[in-house]
Amino acid sequence: MKYIQKTNYQFDLDQLNFEWNNIKEFYLTKDHWYQEVQTCLQHSETCVDKYTEGCGSIKRAGGRTERDFCLINDIYRGTLFETIINELNVVRSRIMISKRHTVYSIHIDRTKRSHLVLNTNPDTFFILSENTIEKSEIMHIPADGYIYMVDTTKPHTFVNAGEESRTHLVMCHG
């Protein structure tokens, strides 16, 4: 079974990285980051902190669902990021950075996720499984501008065993 599917959606990776680097350099401050590795592109109507309340586990959201995080943050208006969010009709979109030599705990998400890799290294990969090694899928998602649909409703983790960090745009399907 394929837990990770390359879609037909492809976007201009150079433009995305140009916009991301400008936003990161000129607009984002330390306060816009959750644990220095996540920042939100969307917020809910009740957010006090529009850039961090949708980060981390959805359990942190105080009863809100992923669908509640549907409003685009101002600094992303008019960007290719907004175009992608609108075209895919996704919610709770975040930039997630996996620092070098890190791994997430195995967990299950409530909804599937779309991933668009902004930058990566060859030693990063998802591991998804049905609790047996025979049914596991291990995959590196390249920085090729394509959207990849990942069934994160199955037990999974992400590993960055490389020397460089990787940056993904992660979007939820509510």
Which role fits each region the language model picked out?
Residues V91, R110-K112, S165:
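Residues that flank catalytic or metal-binding motifs in active/ligand-binding sites
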Residues N119-A143:
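A short beta-strand-loop-beta hairpin characteristic of the jelly-roll/cupin
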Residues K2-I4, T111-R113, H168:
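Intrinsic-disorder/low-complexity, polar/charged segments enriched in Ser/Thr/Lys/Arg/Asp/Glu/Gln
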Residues M1-I85:
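Non-heme Fe(II)/2-oxoglutarate
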Residues I97-S98, I108-T124:
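Short, conserved beta-strand element in jelly-roll/cupin
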